Amino acid sequence: DGTVYNARQVIDTVGHLCDYILFDSAWVGYEQFIPMMADSSPLLLELNENDPGIFVTQSVHKQQAGFSQTSQIHKKDNHIRGQARFCPHKRLNNAFMLHASTSPFYPLFAALDVNAKI
């Protein structure tokens, strides 16, 4: 249903071309818990100031306890904090809210909260 990449290889190959890389982890999210898949998890990588920031999207309903259509956005970029390319939380949140629905379905948000507690 998808392709699992070596996250370090992706960053080493294209990281110098961009400020951030988005990993669509719709069908994974569990790789950091399986030792043989650790290289596939962008969230486990040790990054330095020359690496790009990382965004990871996960479809919660595909592998965790969320309702259909629930997803999470993870951001890993402390290693570039202070650099001009760093995306502060406020900017990311404003962009998210710009594209979020004006008619949110609150049970979806509740499902994400429940999932986070599991």
List each model region and its residues.
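Conserved PLP-enzyme active-site core in the AAT-like
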Residues: D1-I118
